[in-house]
């Protein structure tokens, strides 16, 4: 039984060239472990620079939580580990070499054994805990887990295509996740196996209906004392494969699109793949920017971010911007600039109380923002609203400022 889909959202214009039909396997010559956007990881190396490593082998562990490790995205040679002050990870770069794979033993029975396996095999960081949108703490217990088998972001690959032929792995992963929580939700994925108590949520084609934050706000709002996790359905299938075979899958399905390309490409590549390698031979002449993520919420990057499954290549302006006195006056005006509530803003927030939420964000009103659903959201969930309003500063940045204040005040260090 499916819960009714959200009815609000926008159908975004397509600016990418046509998609090539069949995914191609493409392991780039370089790959890297990097923090997710906004994430700060204080790490300790487990392997020396220059050493040969197997795909899936633990390379780094968190200093504060040594149970949680980061694993090699491919077999190769660990070229360098770049750390910022405080031993915060910038990137750990690997050059492709060999085909070795690291095998994990079967986990101990029960939820604690599953936690230990996910934390020790690098899958824990693919979970995202709300509020605040970070990796769950080691001992955190979620009130619910939402599995996303739908994605309406512009240029995102269809998660159902990634799951094709992996239905058994997905069902095994879903059964495992059910042991970690009292409520398991599955968004999309009609016909895929899931435990009997799973609540299925229908998802429409409009954006942002396929974002976890909007579904969490509607079906299982996050609270400080009752966190909610979300995870991509492809990562759930990876967990199922790890449980039965002891090996982490080598690739994930990634779509490479954007107006600066001659064609849209669907690839199976390693996590942390080099974006330049994924775009090779299909970039149009001229200056361009590589983004990990969608055109709405992606950021400039050299390597694919940990949770991303799309790459956007957009053209850059080739000359200086035309000057105008009115635009210059607006840039010198006070901040934040007023946001005018419109129908587009209402649709971009998919049923959230748009005017009240924007007012709370602009005023820095933490209590009102909490009451209106901010604890279920992260920056990605407001990216379409930023696009619809051209808000300055962006609504997503205002949301992050409020979340950071709440976290500092309410969550023990």
Where are these regions (language model features)?
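N-terminal, Lys/Arg-enriched amphipathic/low-complexity engagement segments
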Residues: 1-46
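A common structural microfeature
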Residues: 28-32, 42-44, 50, 67, ...
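Surface-exposed strand-loop junctions at beta-sheet edges and helix termini
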Residues: 47-48, 53-54, 59, 73, ...
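Short, well-ordered turn and helix-capping elements at secondary-structure junctions
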Residues: 35-37, 63, 260, 294
């Amino acid at each position: 039984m499916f819960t009714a889909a959200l009815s609000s959202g926008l159908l975004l214009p397509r600016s990418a060239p046509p998609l090539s039909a069949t995914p191609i396997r493409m392991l780039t010559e370089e790959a890297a472990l990097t923090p997710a956007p906004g994430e700060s990881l204080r790490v300790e190396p487990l392997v020396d620079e220059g050493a040969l490593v197997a795909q899936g082998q633990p390379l780094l562990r968190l200093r504060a939580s040594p149970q949680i490790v980061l694993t090699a995205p491919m077999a190769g040679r660990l070229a360098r580990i770049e750390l910022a002050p405080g031993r915060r990870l910038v990137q750990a770069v690997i050059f492709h070499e060999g085909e070795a794979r690291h095998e994990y033993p079967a986990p101990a029975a029960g939820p604690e054994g599953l936690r230990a396996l996910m934390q020790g095999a690098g899958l824990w960081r693919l979970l995202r805990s709300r509020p605040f949108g970070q990796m769950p703490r080691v001992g955190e217990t979620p009130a619910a887990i939402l599995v996303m088998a739908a994605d309406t972001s512009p240029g995102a690959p269809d998660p159902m295509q990634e799951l094709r032929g992996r239905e058994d792995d997905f069902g095994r992963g879903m059964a495992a996740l059910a042991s970690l929580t009292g409520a398991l939700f599955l968004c999309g994925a009609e016909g895929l196996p899931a435990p009997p108590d799973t609540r299925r949520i229908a998802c429409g084609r409009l954006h942002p209906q396929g974002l976890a934050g909007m579904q969490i706000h509607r079906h299982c709002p996050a609270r400080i004392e009752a966190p909610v996790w979300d995870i991509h359905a492809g990562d759930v299938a990876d967990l199922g494969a790890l449980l039965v075979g002891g090996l982490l899958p080598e690739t994930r399905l990634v779509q490479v699109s954007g107006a600066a390309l001659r064609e849209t490409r669907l690839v199976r590549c390693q996590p942390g793949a080099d974006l330049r390698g994924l775009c090779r031979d299909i970039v149009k002449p001229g200056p361009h920017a590589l983004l990990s993520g969608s055109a709405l919420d992606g950021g400039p990057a050299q390597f694919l971010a940990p949770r991303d499954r799309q790459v956007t290549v957009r053209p850059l302006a080739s000359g200086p911007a035309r000057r105008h006195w009115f635009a210059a006056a607006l840039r010198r005006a006070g901040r934040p600039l007023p946001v005018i509530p419109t129908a587009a803003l209402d649709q971009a927030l998919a049923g959230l109380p748009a005017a009240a939420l924007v007012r709370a964000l602009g005023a820095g009103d933490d209590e009102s923002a909490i009451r209106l659903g901010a604890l279920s959201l992260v920056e990605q969930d407001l990216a379409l609203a930023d696009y619809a309003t051209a808000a300055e500063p962006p609504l997503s940045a205002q949301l992050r400022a409020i979340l950071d204040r709440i976290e500092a005040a309410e969550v023990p260090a």
